[in-house]
Amino acid sequence: MDRSSASRPDLYLIADNDSVYEQDLLRNPGTIKPWLAYIEYKQQNGTLYEQAFVGRPLDALIISILNDFQVMERACKQLPRSYKLWKMYLEFRTKHLKNRNAIKYRAEFQKVNTLFERALILLNKMPRIWEMYLTFMLQQPLVTQTRRTFDRALRALPVTQHNRIWKLYKTFARSASGQTAVKIWARYMQIHPENAEEYINLLVEMGHYTDAIKRYMEILDNPRFQSREGKSNFQLWTEMVDLLVSKAKKIETGPQTGIDVDAILRSGIDRFADQRGKLWAGLATYWITKGNFEKARDVFEEGITTVMTVRDFTLIFDSYVEFEESIIGSLMEAAAVRADNGKADEEADFDLDLRMLRFEQLMDRRPFLVNDVLLRQNPNNVIEWEKRVALWGDNNVEIVNTYTAAIAAINPKKAVGKFSELWVNYAKFYERGGDLDTARIIFEKAVKVPFKSVNELAETWCEWAEMELRSENFDKAVEIMAKATQAPKKSTVDYFDETLSPQQRIHKSWKLWSFYVDLVESVSSIEETKKVYERIFELRIATPQTVVNYANLLEEHKYFEESFKVYERGLDLFTYPVAFELWNLYLTKAVDRKIGIERLRDLFEQALDGCPPKFARPLYLMYGNLEEERGLARHAMRIYERATRAVSDEDRFEMFEFYITKSASNFGLPSTRPIYERAIAALPDHEAKEMCLKFAEMERRLGEIDRARAIYGHASQFCDPRTNAPFWQKWEAFEVQHGNEDTFKEMLRIKRSVQAQYNTDVNFIASQAIARSQQRAPEGEEATAAAEREMDTETTDAMAALERQARAPIGFVAASTGPEGGNRAPPAGQGPVAAPANPDAIDLDDDMEAD
């Protein structure tokens, strides 16, 4: 390098104050520090020209004059390997050209380019210098030079630093566009194949659709490819298909390019089952775009006959219809033009008529095609096969073909719906046509089919017999049912054993036997009917209705004793509650038949033996009524008395009322006293209270006032005055009518005593509070809270009273003041009892004061 120029600077740029720095440079020519100090000094204290050079934007003329005389230039020439000096110098030079027009200041830009080239002679491994240079080049319209500079940078720098260059290179490719961008990206993809999506977008923007499809195929065939944009393989594949369909004419296909659109879309149809409708329509659209209408029609036909869902079918069919309508519309417009011009084209008119006919046929086929789709989904769908038969209307040939195809396709164990109905309808089809022999052949085959359930097989046998009945072949119908019910003498087959075929279990089908017995009963003799019923009992498949029907049949034919035996056999088969209904019928029939009283008594005793309490009441009433009519009244009373102990708790009160009524009617009112007494002892409190009122009223009617008063006194223990006011009102009315002052006072004393008793019963207080809260519930939550507070207060008062009673002196007995003993005084230390007029305030004030 020529160092003489660095030692001979322009003297007018050197001021007197610069001599110190110049001498320092002479003493240390190879050191960077003096140069940095000199540059910093010049930037702050240079001459007018220098300040203009180093600190302000200059026009091109001044820069051209001062370029060879600046301190930075001298420094870079003196120390050409200094990265720091070159970076400072290059930043300084590029700064003054920032936002300048590269065309207008072309010469100045070229000087800076040359300066970068000088710097890169020795600093070509510095990526920052290359970045500055390339960024500066991007401001200039020099495409070829810029591209070559990028290539030089990539060759000069190690691979680990290429990312810094490629970041700028991709920006340049976008701006350069065209073939340049494509080739740059092709090179970039060799290093970074993971950015294939960005490359594909560029190819699509540039119109290189064939290359874009190839790239799509590459990344889809690469199992290791991970989308930078988070797209799945399906999304990428869908984008490729959309591009193939939309740009069909601009994409090169065939063996030369390796792009087979038909194979690509068909592979997607096999792979993506939920997108088949869209893909079939896309493939057809591709051929339409290519102008191959016949191929498109073939694709549509294949699509609508292979898809598995109605949604996909609808999508393809609608596209197919739209395609045909567009072609017909074009042909009709052409025909209209020919008609206006007076021209005739028989071939074109024939083509239009043919397409119209094809379109009508397509629309007529739609219901059948939809049915085909549903049957492809599940060929075992009996309901859809029936719909297909209905679609054919009066086309007998196709109906037979459909039935035949359905029977061949359906697996009886997997059938959806009743497979037996299909067989039955098939036979009825021939029956309606008058071909009974063929219908019988179909039924013979049907009863051998291993249906899912015995019930289906039973329905098939019954339908066969009904067909014979419709043809008035009664003997044939009976013969068919006899054949259906054939079984070993002592069958051990379990009807619910699914491991056995329906044919092995059919002889225990109640539906089959029910039809059989009705058939025999209507067309055969009573003896034959009895044999069928007996066989039902032998197989132990009789139902309660069977027992009743058999018994009624025998009764109608005057076989009364046999009818009773049938009831008894039924009772051996069934337990309660079914047995209760059978006993009810049996006993009613026996009573109506007027058989011996002793036998009837035995039957009733047998019925009541082991009878649950909830079913006992009707039987006891029937038994008692029998004794009243044909036996002794005392026997009836004993039966009613037994009933009061045997019936359920819910029925006991009513049973006692009935017993009392019967006793009064037969033996007079006094005979009911022991019954009332036992009822009061046996019934719960709330029912005992009602019974006491009835008992007291009965005694009053007999004039036994003292007995009635005693009963009221006994019942008072069940009645809190605050919750059972009607009871006390009745007693008060009784005393007003039949009592005196002493008895009335005694009633009031008992009332206070009972209330005090309930005040100290914590359990009763709690239940009472709950009852009140339930009564006040409609008033809202505030009323409920008030009831709870009242319950707490009463409970506290009751507990305080118990404590005071425990602290009372032992052995203290109050004097008697009343006519019958009077009221007891409160224990020592306790306040006086409140007046009866305000019973709720008993001991409340004293308790509050004690607290």
UniProtKB/Swiss-Prot annotation:
The keyword Nucleus applies. Associated with the spliceosome. InterPro entries: HAT (IPR003107), HAT_Syf1-like_N (IPR055433), HAT_Syf1_central (IPR056350), HAT_Syf1_CNRKL1_C (IPR055430), Syf1-like (IPR045075), TPR-like_helical_dom_sf (IPR011990). Residues 825-841 have a biased composition (Low complexity). It comes from Emericella nidulans (strain FGSC A4 / ATCC 38163 / CBS 112.46 / NRRL 194 / M139) (Aspergillus nidulans). GO terms for cellular component: post-mRNA release spliceosomal complex; Prp19 complex; U2-type catalytic step 2 spliceosome. This is Pre-mRNA-splicing factor syf1. Residues 771-793, 810-851 are annotated as: Disordered. HAT repeats lie at residues 12-44, 63-95, 107-139, 141-175, 291-326, 398-432, 434-470, 487-519, 558-592, 595-629, 667-701, 703-737.
